[in-house]
Amino acid sequence: MIGGGITGASVAYHLAKAGWRDTVLLEKDELTSGSTCHAAGLVTQFNPSPTMMRFRRYSIELYEELGVFEKVGGLRFASSGEQLKELQRGASRARGIGLDVELISADESARLMPAITTRSLHGAVWVPGDGHLDPHTATFALAAAARKLGASVLTQHRVTGIELTDRGSVKAIQTDAGRIEAEVIVIAGGIWAPQIAAMAGAFIVSTPVDHQHAALLAVPGHELPHDMPCFRDPDNLVYGKSEAGGVVLGGYEADPVARWIDGVPWDHAGTSLPPDQARFEPLLAGAARRFPFMGEAGIVKLVCHPDAMTPDSNPLVGPVPGVPGLYLAAGLSLNGFGGGGGIGRSLAELITTGESELDLYPYRPWRFGPVHRDFRYAAELAREAYRYYYYLRYPYDSDEWGRPKRTSALHTRMQDLGAVFGAKHGWERPDYFQPGRAWRRAGADQRSFGFTRPPYFDRLAEEHRAFRERVGIIDMSSFGKIEITGPGALPLLERVAGNLIDRPVGSVVYTQLLEKNGGIAADVTITRLASDHFRLVTGAGYVNSDLGWLRLQMQGGDRDVELRESSDDMSVIGMWGPHARDVLARVTDDDVSEDGFPFMEAHDIRVAGIRVLAQRVTYVGELGWELYVDPAWAGQAWDHLMAAGREFDITPGGYRVLDSLRMEKGYRYYGTDMGLLENPFEAGLGFAVNRDKWASIPREVTRRLRTLAIGEEEYVPIYGGEAVLDRSRVVGRLRSCAYGFTVSKNLAYSYLPVQLKPGGEVQVEVFGRLVPAVVMPDAVLSKLEIKR
C-alpha cells in the first residue's frame, strides 16, 4: 500500500485481516501527513449511491469497533423550499437502498440543535447513526490494528519507482530507502496518485482542489455542547461539528481553486497552504444565517488544503487495466473518512478473492479517457464537481465548465437547427431542439423551473412523435466505438459476451458483456466486419470503461488481439421511424428492402454517392438504421437525408427524447438499469444470453426488472432512485424514468420481487407522498398501438 492516510491504512488492515501477513504500508512522511491530517472527520451515511452508502455504513461500524467514533447524529438542513424537495427526494432514495432516515420539521430540528435559528429553515433530514471522529486518532488506530494482524507500516519511505515484469505486471517498488518486491501494489496516495500510477505507465485522473475549514472560538453564552449533532447546510454551503464549545466549520466555495494540475510537489506534506480569508467569508456568512452568533466568533485557525477530486466526484477504486497487480484507492473526492473503511474492505475482497460484495463499477479507475489527458479540462470538471458538492444540482442540469471540448462533424448543422447542447464525456451533443431559435449550451437550466414539468416538455413530445409516426434523425457521433482485431478477437469476445458472436460477416449482435458470475459489465452491439475484425459500439460515457474492462479480461494464453478506440474515426447518423426506409431508398441505389436488408445486419451502401456502413438496429423500437460515415462526408450525408425526408416531415431529435422512446419498448440503459450486481435474467435480457455458453447463470430469479406506470396521464416529477413500496414495505427503487408520450404514461423501471407481475399495484414515494403505480409488461407499447 502506498499512502499512509485513512484509506491506505484501511486496505492494509483488511488485507492483513484476510490473512495476507506480508502486507506493507508505505508513507513518504508520517501517517496522516496528506489530506487525512486536515480532514474535519465528519461521517454521514446519507448518500444517493448504494455503494457509497454501504461504504459509509461499514466505515462507521469499523470506527466504532476501534473505539474512535462519536455517534452524535447528523442533521442536514433545508434552508429553501427547493432544498426541502431535494431532501424529500434524497430520503426516498435512501429508503430505496436500505437506509432509514427521518425527515423532520424546523421545530424538531431546533429541539435537536437548540443553537440554530429556524428562520428560513424548511426542515431537515435526521440520521441518528452519524457522527464524527479525530482523523489522527482513527488512522493511527487502524494502522495499529493492521500491525497487530501482521502488517508492516514504514514511514519516511517515498516511492521513487515501480518495476514491472516483461509481461507488464507489477514486480517491485523502489523507494528512497530501498527496494521491496511485491506482486500487488495498491496506490492510496491521495493527490500524488496520478504521479505514482505514471511510474507503472498507467494514466489516472484526479486534480487537487483547495478545501478550507476553520476552528471557531466559542462565543460566550453560546457554547456548543460536545455531543451536539453534526450539521450540514447545503443551501449555505457549510458543514460543522462542535469542538471545545466552538465549532469546526468547513464548506464548499462556489469558485474553487485547482492547483498543481501538472503534478504535486513531492515535498508537500501535512502543512497547510496559505489560507484565503476572502474566499472563506461567504461561508462564514452562510453559517451565521443558521447560527446567528457565529458572526461574533473569532477564528482560531483557518486551514487550506488540497483534496484529490475526480471529474465526476467519485473515487477511483479497483484494478488498473494493462498492469496486472496494480490497484487504486485514490481520488476520494472528499469521501475519505466516510468511504475509507468500506473502500478498504471492498478492495481487499477484490484482491484476495477476485470479487467484491459491492458494485465497484461506478468507481472503476479506468472510466476516464484520452479527452481527460488535457489537465486543464480535467481540472475544470473537478472544480465544477466540487462546486456542486453542496450547491443544489438538479437531475437535468448539464456541466458548464470546460466547454466546448469535443464537437462532431455535424455540430454546425445542429447549431443551425436550434440545438440545445448537453455534454457527455466531453462531447457537445443536442439534448433537444428549439426550431427558429438560436442554439445554446444547456447548463443549470432546471434551476429556472425546479422539480416541475420541463418547459421543453411539449418539444420532446413533438420529437417523440416524429420517430414514432414519421421519421426522426439524430446525430449519434458521440457513440463509443472500439475496434477488436486479430486472431484472438473472436475467442475473447465469445468468452465475455452473453450472446453468440461467431456469426457471418455483416452480422450485428446485441449482447451484454458478463463477469464470470453473470454480472453485467456492459451493454453493447458488436458488428462483425471481417473474420478477425469486430466493432463494439457503446455509450459515449462508457467507451473507456468497456475498453478497460476488455483489457482486464485478456488472459496470458490469448492469441494476439488488438483493442483500439475508434470513436473519432467516424460520424454516426441515426434515422428511425415508419418512413425511414422511404427516406433511405431515395438517396441510395442499394437494396434496403425488408428482404434485402434484414434486421441486425450491417451493409456497405452509398448514400448520394458517399460510402456508408449502415446497421439496421434500433434503440427506439422503430424501423431504421445507424449510418457510419467518414466525418469529412458526414455533413453532406446529413443534408441529403434531410432533403429526401422533407416530404415525410423528417425531424431532428436530441438525446433527451431517447429515454421516452426506448422505455415504451422496454429497452434498457447500462449503469442505471443494470450493472455488476444484476444478471441478464434479472434484467429481462435472457433473450440475449446463449445458454450453452452461460449454463452457470441461474435462470430462476427472486427479483426482476419491471416497468411501472406511475400516477395518471399528468406529468409526475420522477428522476430515479425513489423508493417503491408494496403494502408499506420498501421492495425496490426506481431506475430509469421517462414520460411515454405515445402511451401518455409516467414510466419507470424497478427491480421488484418476482411475485409482483404485470397488473400488480405498488406505490412510489415522490417528494414525500405515495403515488400509485401499476406493474406493466416490459414493452408498454406494441406495434399495434402506434398511432399513425
Report each predicted region and the residues it spans.
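C-terminal catalytic lobe of FAD-dependent flavoproteins
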Residues: 235, 271-406
